[in-house]
Amino acid sequence: MDILSNIFGPDKEGLRRSHVKNLVSIALADGHLSEDEWELLVYLASRLGMEEEEINAIRENPEAVKFVMPKTHDQRVQQIEDLVLLMTIDHDINPNEVELCKKISLKLDVLPQIVDDIITGRSQE
């Protein structure tokens, strides 16, 4: 079973929206949203059971979405992996994206070094 299917407990809607808010933030951190980023964002959100309409609502009003902490370390790491995947999909890693990803990592109670480790791992694939 996909870890994203298990990532959410009782407040699964809040967790989904929180994760998608973080994804949208990363996608927009460099000042533009590429087609590749949008397609991946829609795909990742659809895996969480969200429609484009919901993504757009979060994008238009991110302040309405509260941060919700995933319950397990594995779930938090999975979210960071999604963020890095989105950040690297356009092959243009912007320092603002990396900085924001590390801030989100800290908020998720995961050492920010993981962001560099995942980027390095992806570049070696």
Task: Describe each model-derived feature in a short phrase.
Residues M1-I26, H32-E125:
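Small-residue-enriched hydrophobic alpha-helices in membranes
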